[in-house]
UniProtKB/Swiss-Prot annotation:
The organism's taxonomic lineage, starting at the top: Bacteria, Pseudomonadati, Pseudomonadota, Alphaproteobacteria, Rhodobacterales
Domain of life where this protein originates: Bacteria
Family annotation (CDD domains): NTP-PPase_HisIE_like
Keywords annotated in UniProt: Amino-acid biosynthesis, ATP-binding, Cytoplasm, Histidine biosynthesis, Hydrolase, Nucleotide-binding
Its EC number(s): 3.6.1.31
Family matches, as Pfam families: PRA-PH
Protein name, as recorded: Phosphoribosyl-ATP pyrophosphatase
Organism listed in the record: Ruegeria sp. (strain TM1040)
GO biological-process terms attached to the record: L-histidine biosynthetic process
């Protein structure tokens, strides 16, 4: 996970900096809603490439999804480690058992 943590740190270092100096700073300056919108766009592009069965393009879009996911997390002050903690808690649970254990509503 070092690469993702390094990317997270780079993204966090762009928070509050001049939006004209980097794409990340520009995206973060537009707020969490814009960051979420961009994440959604990238996820759709990844889905399209998965359906087309183009592995190279899917890998490229997957990288975009991971980057924009980290930007979206940063925009809401959620750490990657918070997400990893949830994944670790779910590890070993069947997907059906985990879903059934979620609070209703």
């Amino acid at each position: 996970m070092t690469l993702l943590h390094d990317l997270e740190q780079t993204i966090l270092s762009r928070k509050g900096t001049d939006p004209d100096t980097s794409w990340t700073a520009k995206l973060l300056s537009k707020g969490p809603e814009k960051c979420a919108e961009k994440f959604g766009e990238e996820a759709i592009e990844a889905i399209i490439e998965a359906v087309k069965d183009d592995k190279a393009k899917l890998a490229s879009e997957g990288a975009d999804v991971l980057y924009h996911f980290l930007v979206m997390l940063a925009a809401r002050d959620v750490a990657l480690d918070d997400v990893l903690t949830v994944l670790a808690e779910r590890q070993g649970l069947s997907g059906l058992a985990e879903k059934a254990a979620r609070p209703k509503g």
